[in-house]
Regions:
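C-terminal helical subdomain
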Residues: 168-177, 183, 189-230
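Conserved glycine-rich Rossmann-like NAD(P)H-binding loop of the short-chain dehydrogenase/reductase
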Residues: 27-41
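Substrate-binding pocket helix/loop in short-chain dehydrogenase/reductase
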Residues: 91-92, 99-101
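Conserved glycine-rich cofactor-binding loop
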Residues: 12-14
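Active-site helix of classical SDR
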Residues: 115, 151-152
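The beta1-alpha1 cofactor-binding region of Rossmann-like NAD(H)/NADP(H)-dependent oxidoreductases
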Residues: 55-65, 97
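Residue(s) in the substrate-gating loop at a strand-loop-helix junction
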Residues: 135
């Protein structure tokens, strides 16, 4: 039996790895897309159903090449998790136009371009799940988020527009707002810290969204630790 396919864009030792592990545990073939592939290769050695694809989400041709390879290797895509992000920090006096644009290219344009790669087949099947990973900055700007907050806010607006367009076609577009710090599963330094989110628990939320019944779809889910002040 052919496995359903989940593409995770943006792989690291926190959320990206947890998304991959969770969907793999549920029987999915996993495509790991990231600009640098060293960590992804180590993760793929751990997950039997995973394959690694180099992909710079700021380069349209790189996205087209990566997704063509995924389709050739695994088939059409059932779930897309867009976890790529750019932590460009600084105040407005410090940041360059390149810094500002690059943050938008990674957080928003990349999400736009990879979504275009999966929508046609999802429309044809009348089913599919696209999940964007947002942040506190998706909702409000703070000092030193001059580039990051506008990029995350525009990503959220993109997700809203896509959801309103695509839900009637059977494609569930959703957004997870991560409102807090995330611990690294590759380090024991903050394992017991109650004020950090466990990426495995965030991955549980992502999987839940991908399986929601159509009569009760969620668009935006914000997650934070119980100790977080909000």
């Amino acid at each position: 039996m052919t496995k359903p396919v989940c593409v995770v864009v943006g792989i690291g030792p926190q959320n990206g790895a947890s998304f991959a592990r969770r969907f793999a545990s549920e029987g999915y073939a996993i495509a790991l897309l990231s600009r640098k592939t060293e960590y992804s290769s180590n993760l793929a050695a751990e997950i039997d159903s995973a394959k690694v694809y180099a992909c710079d989400v700021t380069v349209p041709s790189a996205i087209e090449t990566a997704f063509a390879a995924v389709r050739a290797d695994m088939g059409e895509i059932d779930v897309l998790v867009y976890n790529a992000g750019s932590g460009v920090w600084g105040n407005i006096e410090e940041l360059s136009a390149h810094d500002f644009e690059q943050s938008w290219r990674i957080n928003t344009m990349g999400a736009f371009l990879v979504s275009k790669e999966v929508i046609p087949s999802m429309k044809k099947k009348k089913t599919g799940s696209i999940i964007f990973i947002g942040a506190t900055a998706s909702l409000r700007g703070k000092p030193f988020t001059t580039a990051f907050a506008p990029a995350k806010a525009s990503q959220r607006s993109l997700a809203q527009a896509m959801a309103r367009q695509l839900w009637p076609s059977g494609i569930h577009v959703s957004l997870i707002i991560i409102d807090g710090g995330v611990k690294s599963l590759d380090s024991d330094a903050n394992v017991e810290a109650p004020e950090t989110l466990d990426p495995d628990d965030i991955a549980t939320t992502a999987y839940f969204l991908s399986q929601q019944p159509r009569s009760a779809w969620s668009f935006e889910v914000d997650v934070r630790p119980s100790q977080e002040s909000w």
